[in-house]
């Protein structure tokens, strides 16, 4: 069954970037649709759970305490060839602090924020095709 929806903004993928883009588009008044093929937003568990306090501030987001698994000071990055790089206040010029996120909770709360701003959502839905109406000259 194909479902046709007319929207101003179509966002494919309800990860952090998609949900945040949908939230801001809807907040600015765009008729927004967020589509995700997974049956549950935030699953399966994804990588990239650590984020520094500095980058949180740059993003301009407030992290809900329910999303925080633990606070961190520094980090060790391990590459595919097992090379390790350690980042702590002892070996770089600034103190790195941040959080490890519960991505399942974090991703869901970002999607809820988008919905609260007026975003329509379709989960367990794969985007097959789309067309663009160029009436505005774009």
Question: Predicted regions: what is each one?
Answer:
Residues 2-17, 33:
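Beta1/beta-strand and adjacent pyrophosphate-binding region of the FAD-binding site
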Residues 42-80:
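N-terminal FAD cofactor-binding segment of flavoenzymes
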Residues 77-138:
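Conserved N-terminal helical subregion
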Residues 19-20, 50:
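Short alpha-helical segment within the catalytic ATP-binding CA
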Residues 5, 70-73, 123, 136:
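Short, basic and Ser/Thr-rich N-terminal targeting/leader segments
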């Amino acid at each position: 069954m194909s479902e046709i929806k007319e929207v101003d903004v179509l966002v494919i993928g309800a990860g952090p970037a998609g949900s945040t883009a949908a939230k801001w588009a809807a907040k600015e008044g765009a008729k927004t649709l967020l589509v995700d093929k997974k049956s549950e937003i935030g699953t399966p568990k994804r990588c990239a759970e650590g984020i520094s306090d500095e980058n949180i501030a740059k993003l301009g987001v407030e992290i809900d305490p329910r999303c925080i698994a633990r606070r961190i000071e520094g980090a060790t990055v391990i590459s595919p060839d097992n090379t390790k790089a350690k980042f702590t206040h002892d070996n770089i010029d600034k103190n790195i602090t941040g959080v490890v996120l519960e991505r399942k909770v974090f991703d869901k709360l970002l999607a809820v924020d988008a919905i609260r701003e007026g975003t329509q959502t379709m989960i367990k839905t794969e985007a097959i095709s789309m067309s663009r109406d160029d009436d505005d000259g774009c």
